[in-house]
């Protein structure tokens, strides 16, 4: 390996005796005796024994290693861009409730295969069909990206989000949020906007961990969104009210308090107990647990003994949920009044379970009243 006079570059001339590696350090010639550094493992001509590094004259050249080559793949299809049909085919894989136990479904990109209100409607309709068919999980959806990302005016972003979600179907098994968060992607070493549906689902999982699934995941106690540098848009109070009326849970950056999920509505459009996340998830918990208990009544006799056995399975469980503040009251009915002769002859078993769910506080009213010095509080306070 040659080194030129200036000491900057290596040449390609490599030569030397068999078993030796010679580094020529002067003029590029491998024939000058005494000017080569030789790593000699055969001691074929040096003056020192035992394989030491010696200075000697090489006699035969080594072959030059060829330059590296590269091979490029050709053909194939770049399938990074997904179509709506491919999304639907993927969601169809999760329809089987017996083989797949699912609790939370993350919608990912709000627009699905596109980035418009129309593509969002298509995507949300697919998710709604999935969770309505399963009826044992909740889907979480964010608006399409360009509805809020890069939009200068907060009022315009609110209008975009409301208009997009107005197209989406009503369901108590779906939850809408309002924006994207700006976060650091440590795997690609960049900052990027990410839809908040993953955070909303994560808050539900966090609530399961520190409390119970029938507690609301929103608010300052359990609704703090982690890892958010900023939001794609931060709705004002008036805009939050507008979003909430449209079934959309606003995510808000409160100065000094962080980014907070500030709503716990489901996507159900009509007034109902199931228009709140905690009530829907409470019933998912109850339905899964009690349905598992009910399986053990299959192929038994539909008599008073079996009915009493079922009640004794369910009532302690509901009392436990009541003690953990999930429900205020309940009643289990499985007797001859709802298991009539016709029901028994059809080889069926009927149980009616009445639940009074606990409700979360969405609005607080504080009344401050100034009274005269001589007035008794019992007179003005009732």
For each feature predicted by the language model, list its residue ranges.
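Structured, hydrophobic secondary-structure cores that serve as assembly/anchoring elements
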Residues: 3-382
């Amino acid at each position: 390996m040659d080194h030129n006079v200036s000491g900057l570059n290596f040449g390609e001339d490599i030569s030397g005796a068999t078993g030796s590696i010679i580094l020529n350090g002067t003029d590029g010639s491998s024939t000058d005796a005494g000017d080569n550094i030789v790593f000699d493992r055969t001691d074929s001509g040096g003056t020192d024994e035992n394989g030491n590094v010696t200075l000697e004259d090489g006699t035969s050249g080594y072959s030059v290693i060829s330059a590296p080559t590269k091979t490029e793949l050709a053909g194939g299809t770049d399938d990074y861009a997904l179509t709506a049909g491919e999304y639907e085919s993927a969601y169809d894989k999760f329809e089987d409730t017996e083989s797949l136990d699912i609790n939370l479904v993350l919608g990912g990109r709000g627009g699905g295969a596109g980035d418009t209100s129309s593509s969002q409607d298509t995507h949300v309709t697919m998710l709604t069909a999935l969770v309505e068919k399963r009826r044992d999980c909740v889907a979480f959806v964010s608006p399409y990206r360009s509805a809020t990302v890069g939009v200068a005016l907060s009022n315009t972003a609110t209008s975009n989000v409301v208009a997009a979600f107005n197209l989406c179907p009503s369901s108590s098994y779906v939850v809408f949020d309002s924006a994207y968060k700006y976060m650091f992607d440590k795997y690609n070493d960049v900052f990027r906007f990410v839809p908040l549906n993953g955070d909303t689902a994560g808050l539900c999982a966090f609530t399961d961990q520190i409390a119970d699934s029938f507690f609301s995941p929103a608010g300052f106690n359990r609704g703090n969104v982690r890892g958010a540098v900023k939001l794609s848009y931060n709705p004002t109070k008036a805009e939050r009210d507008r979003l909430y009326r449209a079934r959309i849970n606003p995510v808000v950056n409160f100065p000094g308090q962080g980014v907070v999920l500030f709503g716990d509505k489901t996507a159900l459009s009509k007034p109902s107990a199931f228009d709140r996340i905690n009530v829907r998830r409470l019933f998912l918990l109850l339905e899964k647990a009690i349905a598992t208990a009910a399986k053990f009544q299959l192929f038994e006799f539909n008599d008073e003994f079996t009915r009493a056995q079922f009640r004794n399975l369910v009532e302690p469980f509901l009392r436990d949920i009541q003690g953990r503040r999930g429900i205020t009251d309940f009643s289990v009915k499985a007797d001859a009044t709802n298991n009539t002769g016709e029901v028994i002859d059809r080889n069926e078993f009927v149980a009616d379970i009445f639940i009074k769910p606990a409700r979360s506080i969405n609005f607080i009213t504080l009344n401050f009243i100034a009274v005269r010095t001589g007035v008794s509080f019992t007179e003005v306070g009732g």
